Amino acid sequence: MIPYAAGVIVPLALTFLVQKSKKEKKRGVVVDVGGEPGYAIRNHRFTEPVSSHWEHISTLPELFEISCNAHSDRVFLGTRKLISREIETSEDGKTFEKLHLGDYEWLTFGKTLEAVCDFASGLVQIGHKTEERVAIFADTREEWFISLQGCFRRNVTVVTIYSSLGEEALCHSLNETEVTTVICGSKELKKLMDISQQLETVKRVICMDDEFPSDVNSNWMATSFTDVQKLGRENPVDPNFPLSADVAVIMYTSGSTGLPKGVMMTHGNVLATVSAVMTIVPDLGKRDIYMAYLPLAHILELAAESVMATIGSAIGYGSPLTLTDTSNKIKKGTKGDVTALKPTIMTAVPAILDRVRDGVRKKVDAKGGLSKKLFDFAYARRLSAINGSWFGAWGLEKLLWDVLVFRKIRAVLGGQIRYLLSGGAPLSGDTQRFINICVGAPIGQGYGLTETCAGGTFSEFEDTSVGRVGAPLPCSFVKLVDWAEGGYLTSDKPMPRGEIVIGGSNITLGYFKNEEKTKEVYKVDEKGMRWFYTGDIGRFHPDGCLEIIDRKKDIVKLQHGEYVSLGKVEAALSISPYVENIMVHADSFYSYCVALVVASQHTVEGWASKQGIDFANFEELCTKEQAVKEVYASLVKAAKQSRLEKFEIPAKIKLLASPWTPESGLVTAALKLKRDVIRREFSEDLTKLYA
């Protein structure tokens, strides 16, 4: 009897001790700071914000050159060879471009430095002056990175612009910064040509593709990226390294409200974030391979690639449209980018991780029977273990489930992922756990903004908690200040709450030519530290980790005085398998909220087929009362799982068939909702929901 009792008591005791040690570990500690009174936390390992991880290095081009020389013969930048393009026509007459891609072809660190030096010299030879600005307007690719480093080497400020930006925002960005040279792909060059008469200062265009339209504006000097490099190789120019305080990048936000704002980042700002991130992922180094596919015009991707370049890791370039074996642009039988690259590290925005989760669940549900039961059982066993229970699947049993169930799922992302970095928006706890178990890798949730150069907080490698964004990065102090109007106070129990304010060497200079907005959200305290007021609401856990709980702008007061956090409700409802995207809308003149739901075509059509419901197309199905009721019931279930209040659950919904994409203008390039645009686009539907 004693062995059996021990078999129960020992695991329980170990579970208690492990969970207790996790709770007791201090990841952030309280710190006394200047400025507006509040509750401030710093990283537990650093008493002051870190500016540079390297002595005597204060700018990005210095760091890049040292890294390239140190890792000269190692592979660095990889691009897949394009074998062929094909046009396929679907049954409804729509055409789709499909790509047949080969293996990755690599540049070493040494060859990349040569390419950067050649481009920097070529930039001078075509007439670009140091005091003029360059804009990079293209999808993420190796030429983007080389262009950026080439400009840094000549102390030229780079204006970054999303390739999905609309005409009005594109004109605004280029004209406001008085850009004289634009570096772009052939696709983006066509966009520039359409608005050429509205561009006031552009003189030169460098096309990353050797083949580009011949009818370029006659007032522009148009040349290929290859020719600029050739010109620089034949006429080398000495570097003109910047100072730490010089502006490296003017990064235009993706503009979820109104025209995009240009955030001015110094070399010191970016270097501080790079230095801080270096301390987070253990054993980060030469053996790692990074999958680069998010927009380099987004600070999350730019910072991540800067870190990889510094530590000697390889970077393989891809695209969201060719990422996996089943991606939209991948020709059947061709490997997706992750399968070809087999990366060890990836960044992802929550929307992409949600799609991975939904895709796996759809396949499991479609198989049904024994396969589904096996998956559900294995998942439950691993979930118990990852939540700290010694009665979950550990050791040999974990290995068994990995081999039998999860190995094929891991292959979706190449099979070698050891760390995922999520940022740009809140990640649901459900998705985080699902990816943890099925991909077999921890997800580091980060919190930062363009204005903080991506710096803010980051969850540590061994922190398996969900719903939090970690402790302050070594480059930042994070402070909560009272927002009395919204009912969030630093004196709240059991955890202090308030608006999140970030300070440190990563805080940017402000908005380009927008002093009024800069003064509104940037403050300098009596100690000289710069702070940014984020507009997000958070709370600190006892271990010093931050949790995002609201956003000031997304909170609406209903007719009877209740407050609804739109973002919080959307995050809760998005776990429904029927939801592709969702926007909750609340009108203060009513006592309830409503929602626009972009339905998941695969899931809703699958349900309708099982129910024997006839429909001519998906658009018609979304108007059927049975479909609306089914989706609504799923939303209510998700709301109850997340313990939403009754007034937070949308009373009525409208099902939409067409997806919201950056091209549609309804979401940003980072897939964030453009609420004002969506409200205008669907104003009639919203009015009917309140009728």
From Swiss-Prot:
Keywords of this entry: ATP-binding, Chloroplast, Fatty acid metabolism, Ligase, Lipid metabolism, Magnesium, Nucleotide-binding, Plastid
This protein's GO CC annotations: chloroplast; chloroplast envelope; mitochondrion; plastid
Family matches, as PROSITE patterns: AMP_BINDING
Pfam families according to UniProt: AMP-binding (PF00501)
Cofactors that this protein relies on: Mg(2+)
Cell compartments where the protein resides: Plastid, Chloroplast envelope
Residue numbers binding ATP: 250-261
GO MF term list: ATP binding; long-chain fatty acid-CoA ligase activity
Catalysed conversion reaction: a long-chain fatty acid + ATP + CoA = a long-chain fatty acyl-CoA + AMP + diphosphate
Distribution of this protein across tissues and organs: Highly expressed in developing seeds and young rosette leaves.
Any Gene Ontology biological process: fatty acid metabolic process
Fatty acid-binding: annotated segments: 525-553
Enzyme Commission numbers on file: 6.2.1.3
Taxonomy, superkingdom: Eukaryota
Transmembrane segments: none
Family of the protein in this entry: Belongs to the ATP-dependent AMP-binding enzyme family.
Protein name: Long chain acyl-CoA synthetase 9, chloroplastic
Organism in which the protein naturally occurs: Arabidopsis thaliana (Mouse-ear cress)
